[in-house]
Curated annotation (Swiss-Prot):
This is Probable deoxyhypusine synthase. SUPFAM superfamilies: DHS-like NAD/FAD-binding domain. Pfam families: DS. Catalyzes the NAD-dependent oxidative cleavage of spermidine and the subsequent transfer of the butylamine moiety of spermidine to the epsilon-amino group of a specific lysine residue of the eIF-5A precursor protein to form the intermediate deoxyhypusine residue. Keywords: Hypusine biosynthesis, NAD, Transferase. GO terms for molecular function: deoxyhypusine synthase activity.
Length: 297
């Protein structure tokens, strides 16, 4: 296929931009265009079960409302995320305001690079977690805990998932403020967080899928939780990965999706695209453009 050159049009929308990237076809532009085509296939077919995996500071970086929209539009069937994104989604819903104060420490604020949140917001979160946990006892899966949290929030992707019945898995939840409060509560209450039950639930979801797709933002534990489950059925049929990590160190986060075929986590004939870049920038462009393409307003 001949490499084309980018042509600007004054009336170009995001869908048009992505189509132009696909027409160019080369290097990062081509990968972005192919990713849009794969995402379009995943989102336009009722036969594809779509997993969204999220590592890194997605909610602190402003993507929480986009995740909420994807859930409410029925574009994702399950979310696998780090505990930090769960915490920051709850903080936003509880009125904790993320502010951008530059790359510096500020008294009374916790910092994620140039984005800050007041430490008093975590006091509200602590009270919120006590209320949630006080109503739970015995063995509780992580997704059930996150659903209970979502039911008590007025907004955010946790609330959307609770409303729409979309499971949220967080296999590394103990490494977060949620995990800390679970541990504290379990010291003198009959409460056990059952992470194995989440694996049973995800395995059933994967086995029942006619086709399986994944949107992988970052990498780490959420990526592997999805790909490990996909191995139970011979691998993913579709996948788009956006990561800043590189493959030379052998890390999972930097591994291209083609590498997953050697582990049968991705099918040999799967349609995949790995984009190297900041997903906080790339994913909103990609998702918004494909939603335009599908007529979602």
């Amino acid at each position: 296929m001949k490499r084309e050159t980018f042509r600007y049009r004054g009336d170009m929308d995001l869908d048009g931009f992505l189509r132009e990237m696909e027409r160019v076809g080369a290097l990062g532009a081509g990968r972005l265009g192919r990713a849009a085509r794969i995402l379009e296939k995943m989102w336009s077919s009722d036969d594809v079960t779509v997993l969204l995996t999220v590592a890194g500071p997605a909610v602190a970086g402003g993507l929480g409302e986009l995740f909420e929209r994807l859930i409410r539009e029925g574009l994702v069937d399950a979310v696998i995320t780090s505990g930090a994104n769960v915490v920051h989604d709850a903080l936003d819903a509880l009125g904790g305001i993320h502010v951008c104060l530059g790359e510096r420490n500020v008294d009374g604020y916790g910092r994620v690079h140039d984005t800050h949140i007041p430490t008093e917001a975590f006091e509200k979160f602590e009270h919120f977690m006590r209320e949630v946990l006080s109503d739970l006892s015995g063995r509780v899966s992580c997704r059930e805990l996150l659903w209970e949290m979502g039911k008590r929030l007025e907004s955010g992707f946790l609330r959307a998932a609770a409303d729409e019945g979309v499971p949220i898995y967080s296999p590394g939840i103990l490494d977060s403020m949620v995990g800390l409060h679970v541990w504290i509560h379990s010291q003198d209450h009959d409460f056990h967080l059952d992470l194995v039950d989440d694996m049973h639930h995800l395995a059933d979801l994967v086995f029942e899928a006619e086709e399986l797709g994944a949107i992988i933002l970052g990498g780490s534990v959420p990526k592997h939780f999805a790909m490990g489950a996909a191995m139970l059925r011979g691998g993913l049929d579709y996948a788009v990965q956006i990561t800043m990590d590189r493959p030379e160190t052998g890390s999972l986060s930097g591994a291209p999706l083609e590498e997953g075929k050697s582990w049968e986590k991705v099918r040999e004939d799967a349609e995949v695209a790995t984009i190297v870049g900041d997903y906080l920038i790339i994913f909103p462009l990609l998702a918004s453009g494909v939603m335009q393409r599908l007529g979602i307003v």
